[in-house]
From Swiss-Prot:
UniProt entry keywords in alphabetical sequence: Coiled coil, DNA-binding, Nucleus, Transcription, Transcription regulation
Species classification: Eukaryota, Viridiplantae, Streptophyta, Embryophyta, Tracheophyta
This protein's name: Agamous-like MADS-box protein AGL97
Originating species: Arabidopsis thaliana (Mouse-ear cress)
Annotated function: Putative transcription factor.
GO biological process terms held by the UniProt record: positive regulation of transcription by RNA polymerase II
Amino acid sequence: MGGVKRKIAIEKIQNKNPRAVSFSKRRKGLYSKASELCLLSDAEIAIIATPVSSNSNAAFYSFGHSSVDNVVAAFLANQRPCDERFWWEDESLLKSENLEELREAMDSMSTMLRDLKELEKQRDHQTQTLIHQPCSARVCIQDYVTVNFDGFNTEEQTLAVSDNSNNNGLLGNLDECNEDFDDLDQIFDTVTNSEFLSVNLEMDDVTVNSEGNTEEQTLAVSDNSNNNGLLGNLDECNEDFDDLDQIIEYLTSSEALSMNLKMDDV
């Protein structure tokens, strides 16, 4: 015997889990009934439902024929929704016997079908490129990592050990170089100090020379004054020499006279 089907009371379900289950089932049933009504009566329907939980990812659940936006916009404007069907869906075309009109409708449908297939190919190509690019990159990275680890397990370990020993030797050499650099720093310090000393000595020599120059200038001034005195003495000597010349000329002239007198006496 089949069990008796228990009816659910039409009131708010307090428990969250049964409420969510009931919402999901009855929403799908409502959409199914609305789609049947649209097909049977050519009605345009829009259904908007809020989710049960406030933490849901979806803000609204909607169903519409021909579209929710078209029906809601027509409702807000208080107008009949625009007919968005294709022109060949008109009932008058089904009863038409005009071959040219039917041929035009078939051409329009074939063109639309060809465009839809082209768009579908482009969509599939884009999805394949988006799917395969990350996968191929990931595979390449994994292969590269495995190759590196495989090689590192055998040869690169020995190289790492030898590199460590070489690094230890290099560290020792670096310590010696540091000591040499310390010695060079001391040498540079002594050289710079000696250069500063030589510069200071040269400055002292310059000051001494300047002082000596002042003394030499005073000596030169005194020598100039002495020379002036000597020049005065020389002038006096020249005057004396002039007097002597006169005396000598006088004596020579007197001797010449005496000689002439003696010759006359003879």
